[in-house]
Design a protein with these regions (language model features):
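Conserved glycine-rich cofactor-binding loop
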Residues: 19, 26-27
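C-terminal substrate-recognition "lid" of short-chain dehydrogenase/reductases
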Residues: 100, 234-263, 268
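Active-site loop immediately N-terminal to the catalytic Tyr-X3-Lys motif
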Residues: 119, 166-172, 194-195, 233, ...
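Short, small/polar-rich loop/turn modules that mediate ligand/substrate recognition or access, typified
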Residues: 193, 198, 256-258
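A glycine/serine/threonine-rich, flexible loop-to-helix segment
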Residues: 54-60, 194, 201, 206-230
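Substrate-binding pocket helix/loop in short-chain dehydrogenase/reductase
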Residues: 117-130, 222, 226
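Active-site helix of classical SDR
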Residues: 141, 177
Length: 269
C-alpha cells in the first residue's frame, strides 16, 4: 500500500484498531457515538441496562444496535450491566477488556436523571444519582486508566450537561453530580497529562433524545422550548454531540485535556 493510500485510509477510518467502551449506549447520544466509532473503524462494546430499557419502553433497543454494529465490526458487543450495583463499574471495564482485548477509549454516557422539587428530594434519590452518575465512574476510571497510562495512549470522554454550570431548579442533584464528575475529569486529566492519556467533558445543551421525548408530545410547546433554549433557537441532535466525542478521541484531539466543551447552540453565552 502506498503512503498516499495509507493516509487516505487513515482519514476515512481514523479510529481503525481502537477499542472503545461506551456506557449508556442503547439510545440517544451514546447510540450515535457507537455508530460513528464503528463507521470510522473502531470496535466497540456498548453498555446498556436491559431492565431500564424495558422500564422506559425501549426493550430490545440494544440488541438492534449491536446487530447493526456487528455488520461493520463483527467483534463489537453489547454488555448488560446495572451501574447501580456496587463495584459494577470495574466489572464493566473488565468485561469490555475481555471482549475487545483492552479498552483504548472510554466514553461515559450513562446517567440517571430524576426531576424533583428541591423540597421533595429524598436520601434514596441522592444515593441513586451519586451511585450511577459518580461512584460507577470512579470505579471505571480506576480500572481503565492504568492500562491506558501503561500503553502511553488513551482517551476518556465524559458526557456532561449544561446543567453542571446552569442548573435546572428541578435537577439539583443531577446537576451537582455532573459538576462533581467534571471536577473528577479535570483532576485526572492533570494526573495523566504526561502519560498520553487525555480526559475531557462534552456538555450538551438541549438535544432531541428519547429521554426528553415526552416534551415533544405537544409540538407547539416543544418549539417554544427550542426557541428559548439557545441563540440558535433549536434543539441539537445526538450526531452533533457524537462528532465532538470522536474528535476528542482522535489524534487530532491529542493536545486537548481537562476541557469542558459545550455543544449547546450557544446556550452558555
Amino acid at each position: 500500500m502506498s503512503q498516499s493510500t495509507q493516509l487516505q485510509t487513515h482519514r476515512l477510518t481514523p479510529h481503525a484498531g481502537r477499542r472503545v467502551l461506551i456506557t449508556g449506549a442503547s439510545l440517544g447520544i451514546g447510540r450515535e457515538v457507537a455508530r460513528l466509532f464503528v463507521a470510522e473503524g473502531a470496535t466497540v462494546a456498548i453498555h446498556y441496562s436491559r431492565q431500564i430499557d424495558e422500564m422506559t419502553g425501549y426493550a430490545g433497543a440494544a440488541a438492534v444496535l449491536v446487530s447493526d454494529l456487528q455488520a461493520l465490526s463483527p467483534r463489537s458487543v453489547g454488555l448488560d450491566v446495572d451501574l447501580g450495583a456496587p463495584a459494577s463499574g470495574a466489572q464493566l471495564v473488565e468485561r469490555a477488556s475481555e471482549a475487545l482485548g483492552g479498552v483504548d477509549v472510554l466514553v461515559v454516557c450513562a446517567s440517571t436523571q430524576m426531576r424533583e422539587r428541591f423540597e421533595a428530594i429524598t436520601a434514596e434519590s441522592i444515593a441513586r444519582h451519586a451511585r450511577v452518575n459518580f461512584e460507577a465512574s470512579v470505579e471505571m476510571l480506576q480500572a481503565a486508566l492504568p492500562p491506558m497510562a501503561a500503553a502511553g495512549w488513551g482517551r476518556v470522554i465524559s458526557i456532561g450537561s449544561l446543567n453542571q454550570t446552569r442548573p435546572d431548579p428541578e435537577l439539583a442533584v443531577y446537576a451537582a453530580m455532573k459538576a462533581a464528575h467534571h471536577n473528577l475529569i479535570r483532576n485526572l486529566a492533570r494526573v495523566h497529562a504526561a502519560d498520553g492519556v487525555t480526559l475531557n467533558t462534552v456538555s450538551p445543551g438541549l438535544i432531541s433524545t428519547p429521554r426528553n421525548a415526552w416534551r415533544r408530545e405537544n409540538l407547539d410547546e416543544w418549539h417554544d422550548i427550542e426557541r428559548k433554549a439557545n441563540p440558535m433557537h433549536r434543539a441539537g441532535c445526538p450526531e452533533e454531540v457524537a462528532s465532538m466525542v470522536l474528535l476528542l478521541a482522535s489524534d487530532a484531539g491529542a493536545f486537548i485535556t481537562g476541557a469542558d466543551i459545550p455543544v449547546d447552540g450557544g446556550a452558555h453565552l
